Design a protein with these regions (language model features):
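Soluble, cytosolic/nucleoplasmic coiled-coil alpha-helices used as oligomeric scaffolds and tethers
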Residues: 58, 65, 78, 85, ...
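Amphipathic alpha-helical coiled-coil segments
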Residues: 71-91, 113-117
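Amphipathic alpha-helical binding modules
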Residues: 93-152
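Short, charge-rich amphipathic alpha-helices with coiled-coil/heptad character
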Residues: 2-28
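Charge-rich, solvent-exposed alpha-helical interaction surfaces
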Residues: 37, 44, 71, 117-120
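Non-transmembrane amphipathic alpha-helical segments
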Residues: 41-55, 75, 82
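Short, charged, amphipathic alpha-helical segments
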Residues: 62-73
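Short, charge/polar-rich alpha-helical segments
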Residues: 20-42, 54, 58
Length: 152
């Protein structure tokens, strides 16, 4: 069906349906700006992880490891947020309001790759938080006993 044969009523419906609100456009622009920083945030997370792993490898005391662990957690969180923002930016502004459009867009390979990267960073952050970070040094100063799991 060519452009001359289209119904005027359907043309109006289609044009009006694809409009994006100002709030969705603003959220999209904010996510696009955050997504632009993803590579630098990921590099900061890698540097923080290397510093933390080095401190663990040399057997640094918990007082030295704890700030490095906090820095790693913050860097992983920032990189993860940027990855999810990149996913939303790849979907586009219409995805903020149209759940069907968003779901269809998530099936695209480019969006799927960004989702995988964001979830990988989320899993890495949670793994470190559950198993890899030392206890806060202030607990010793407060006289609070911290439960420790036996090491195998």
């Amino acid at each position: 069906m060519g452009p001359a044969r289209r119904s005027a009523k359907l043309t109006r419906v289609t044009k009006g349906k694809n409009k994006v609100s100002g709030a969705a456009e603003a959220a999209y622009l904010a996510d696009a700006a955050l997504a632009d920083n993803f590579d630098s945030l990921l590099a900061q997370a890698r540097e923080a992880e290397q510093a933390f792993r080095h401190a663990q490898a040399v057997g640094a005391p918990a007082d030295e490891q704890y700030p490095l662990a906090q820095r790693l957690s913050a860097a992983l969180t920032a990189a993860m947020r940027a990855a999810y923002a990149a996913e939303r930016a790849e979907i586009g502004p219409r995805g903020y309001e149209d759940r069907i459009y968003r779901r269809q867009a998530k099936a695209r390979p480019a969006v799927h790759a960004l989702t995988d990267e964001a979830e990988r960073l989320l899993t890495l952050r949670e793994t470190y938080q559950l198993t890899g970070f030392p206890a806060r040094p202030k607990t010793q100063a407060l006289g609070v006993q911290v439960a420790r799991l036996p090491s195998h």
